[in-house]
Design a protein with these regions (language model features):
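Conserved, mostly hydrophobic/aromatic
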Residues: 68, 125, 146, 204, ...
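Alpha/beta enzyme core
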Residues: 189-315, 320-336, 352-354
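Acidic (Asp/Glu)-rich catalytic clusters
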Residues: 163-171, 294
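N-terminal secretory signal peptides and thylakoid transit peptides that target proteins
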Residues: 1-16
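Glycine-rich active-site/cofactor-binding loop and its immediate structural neighborhood
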Residues: 120-156
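An N-cap/entry alpha-helix motif that binds or orients negatively charged groups
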Residues: 35-116, 222-263, 399-401, 407-412
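Glycine-rich beta-to-alpha transition loops that act as phosphate-gripper elements at the mouths
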Residues: 157-160, 181, 280-287, 333-346
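C-terminal helical cap(s) of enzyme catalytic domains, especially alpha/beta-barrels
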Residues: 317, 323, 368-386
Length: 412
């Protein structure tokens, strides 16, 4: 299949007008097959610049082609056989959008407010570690892209660039994602550093416990451990956490995972007492835990299963939103990530009760493909798609997106 025909088929597959188009025999099926194909296309079919992308999926094969197999496997696989990761994506198919007609949608407002700060879009950048593993500019490129497109950004504990440098590149402080350290003194040290850097919010992660079985990644890493300069700092691999800028001043082992303890609600209260930053808990997926989060003084609830990277056989995060929203009952903002690939996904998550919606792998595809322009293009595409579905559904502001805008196919 030549590149032009492939691009045309992908464009057709992404269109809501497919049922109404008089396509030649077999074209609709071919379009669907093209959109679903996970094989890396020939180099002649890869986009050559970020500006050529029609959807965020166009960046995925470019990133795969550019990255060493070991790096790509780490980014693209999930826990066990990646079932939870796949469920995150497929979960959005359960919901369909109800469109209203004859509404003046000449002006659409995509802005949201979080903790008295206004953002131009509810789409934010979820925490992902080790950006320099995928592009030499790493988190600096991501921060500049987030700044230029006015998106909220959450920085990972295992960032390969310090929070101070990221904030300088961005021009304003990011939110900071925190793993529990085994020693409270180390956690306290991290909190003070992040607080001194001006970060307004701390995102405490509780969805990565007891290790993880990265079966597919391990199969690839056994076959290929190709080295590259981007993975090394001062001659040492960045997988050694002692080289990570937010951890190198602490007593950290050389293991490829943070030293994650076993957090409890008492620990959450301890965090709350230790800082003036807003505190969110990342990894909440049930009503019971959402209610406990509010009872323990949490300022925000973050629905996540770590992109399906840590826990297997979990529900897709999109199917947890309504339940968690019932537990929160409007008392705190709700963030969610997992499987977000389209503007319609953002819309559905908001309709179910989310306040803001995070993307992870897509912007990393953009970063690995073209650096800062790639991240910017991913954010632009998602925002345009989100604006489009708002207009198509007759909604003029994010506040107008609610449960009446979607239908649960399993209950209709």
């Amino acid at each position: 299949m030549d590149a032009d025909r492939r691009r045309l088929l992908q464009l057709i597959a992404s269109s809501s007008l497919v049922p109404f188009l008089e396509l030649p025999d077999g074209w609709a099926d071919a379009a669907h097959a093209s959109a679903q194909s996970s094989a890396t296309p020939p180099d002649s079919e890869l986009i050559a610049s970020a500006a050529e992308a029609l959807s965020v999926f166009d960046f995925e094969p470019v990133a795969r082609a550019k990255l060493p197999p070991w790096h790509w496997a780490w980014l693209s696989t999930g826990g066990d056989g990646s079932e939870t990761m796949q469920a995150n994506r497929e979960g959005f198919e359960r919901y369909q959008i109800r469109a209203r007609r004859l509404v003046d949608v000449s002006k659409v407002d995509t802005s949201v407010r979080l903790f008295n700060q206004s953002w131009e879009t509810p789409i934010f950048l979820s925490p992902v570690g080790g950006h320099r593993t995928y592009n030499p500019d790493g988190e600096l490129a991501t921060a500049r892209a987030a700044k230029s497109k006015r998106h909220l950004q959450v920085l990972s504990t295992v960032t390969t660039t310090s929070v101070e440098d990221v904030n300088a590149a961005r021009g304003e402080p990011v939110w900071f994602q925190l793993y529990q350290r085994d020693e409270w003194g180390q956690t306290r040290q991290l909190i003070k550093r992040v607080e001194s850097a001006g970060c307004p919010a701390l995102v405490f992660t509780v969805d990565l416990l007891g290790g993880r079985n990265m079966e597919q990644f391990n199969r690839v890493s056994q076959r290929n451990r190709q080295q590259c300069g981007a993975c090394h700092l001062n001659g040492q691999p960045l997988t050694d956490l002692r080289n990570r800028p937010m951890l190198n001043a602490l007593s950290v082992s050389a293991t490829p995972q943070p030293e994650i303890g076993t957090p409890t609600w008492d620990y959450v209260k301890r965090l709350k007492d230790a800082t003036g930053m807003k505190l969110l808990v990342k990894g909440i997926v049930t009503r019971e835990d959402a209610e406990l989060a509010i009872q323990n003084g949490v300022d925000g609830v973050y629905i996540s299963n770590h992109g399906g990277r840590a826990e297997n056989s979990l529900r897709p995060t999109v199917q947890c939103i309504s339940e968690v929203a019932a537990g929160v009952a409007g008392r705190a903002p709700i963030l969610v990530d997992g499987g977000i690939r389209r503007g319609t996904d953002v819309y559905k998550a908001l309709a179910l009760g989310a306040t803001a919606v995070g993307v992870g792998r897509p912007y990393m595809w953009g970063l690995a493909s073209f650096g800062q322009p790639g991240v910017e293009a991913v954010l632009d595409i998602l925002r345009r798609e989100f604006q489009l579905i708002m207009r198509q559904s007759g909604v003029t502001s994010v506040r107008g997106i609610g449960a009446t805008q979607i239908v649960d196919r399993q209950r209709s």
